Amino acid sequence: MKVSEALAKRKSTRAFLNKTVDVEKIKRILNAAKQAPSGVNTQPWQVAVVMGEKKKLLEQRLENAYRSGIKGQMDYQYYPCEWHEPYKTRRKACGLQLYTALEINRDDKEKQIDQWVANYRAFDAPIMLLFFMDSDMATGSFLDYGMFLQSVMLAA
């Protein structure tokens, strides 16, 4: 498949089959993605592959923390404090499309929470890839990191 085709067919998957994933395939994907460019070859990315009992334990801990009201600390602000156009409209449309597809009503807070918790289970994928970068890396490393992540997705 051409890269342009892969990009055009891109989708966000929020449900996975309970199928075994070949760990060697994951290694091949990550090794291919390591060829992504990075400023002065810093290669700031780190990846943890989590599966089996360790994945179940991590998922349970994350869900328990979330449902207990424990808030994690971000090393950086991901979203703006206040949304402005056109981003506000795009965000709202995306949420509406997702919740409509999942048949979650606006007033059904319990189902909304359950859907959010699915994030912490990696949407039941058999393997979870956790991506890290040292917190002392500068803003430019986010660009390197993004190219690595895109390479992982294209290699997959």
Residue ranges and their predicted role:
Residues 1-156:
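Acidic, surface-exposed loops and disordered segments
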